[in-house]
Amino acid sequence: ITTRLVGSEMCIRDRNRDKWAVDIDFANEQYKFTLADLDMDGQVELLVSHCGGTGIFSYTSFYKVDKDGKLKELDTTFSEYESQPDLMDSVSDESDVTVYSNIINGKGCYNYIVYDFMKESPDCYIYRVSSLAIVDDVVTETKLAIEYETYEDPDYEATISYEDYNGTELTEDEYRTYAARYYEAQQASEHRAHFKWIDVSDIVGVSDSEAAQILMESYDAYSFH
């Protein structure tokens, strides 16, 4: 892993840093990156994520160092202009994610359970659960279930409801256990992944040696078990 990372971080750092480590011209509460091997193929992925705005929207770009040592941005199945899952923790620079692995067409598939909290309208917030997996170099989202929290009552008391993406109504317990039940039905194995997120501003404008240390700090903290 270390050998692969050395080549990968050189690619990310030296030849491609200006592609992803840039200042953005709009305000965001969070703008961070992390390194990981999401699909367990020995090639490092770079995730660059930002979150903020009145709708609390999140957007993430996924990059992969290919076998030729080039950094390429992966395609995704996300809908344009829609909020994407919140991959960063809102409080900590470190995050833990539940992962379910199974075999699809003879290949290992790693499904990361992720959540997205957003303001859908002035009186409605939603909290949805989905999974992300890299399938043939495409970041693929599987939408699972959603919680609606509405404040139409004159006393501003919340009305909460739950449903899956087929529109079937769920209880609170069914919603909270939906991802586990969905993947257990596929006989998937459960794992945990740990990520360390670092502010993009920390790596903008620094020397290559400093950038190497920062990248290594993120990857060294990454774990999967």
What are these regions (language model features)?
Residues 13-23, 80-89:
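Surface-exposed loop and turn segments in beta-propeller and other repeat-based domains
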Residues 57-75, 130-135:
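Beta-propeller blade repeat segments, especially FG-GAP/WD-type strand-to-loop junctions
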Residues 1-7, 11-12:
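Single conserved hydrophobic/aromatic residue that forms the stacking wall/gate
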Residues 29-38, 87-109:
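Beta-propeller blade termini
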Residues 54-58, 122-125:
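Short, solvent-exposed loop/turn segments at conserved positions within beta-propeller repeat blades
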Residues 72-80, 141-146:
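Beta-propeller fold detector
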Residues 40-50, 105-113:
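Acidic/hydrophobic-patterned starts of short beta strands in beta-sheet-rich repeat architectures
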Residues 100-225:
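Acidic, small-residue rich beta-repeat scaffolds with periodic aromatic anchors
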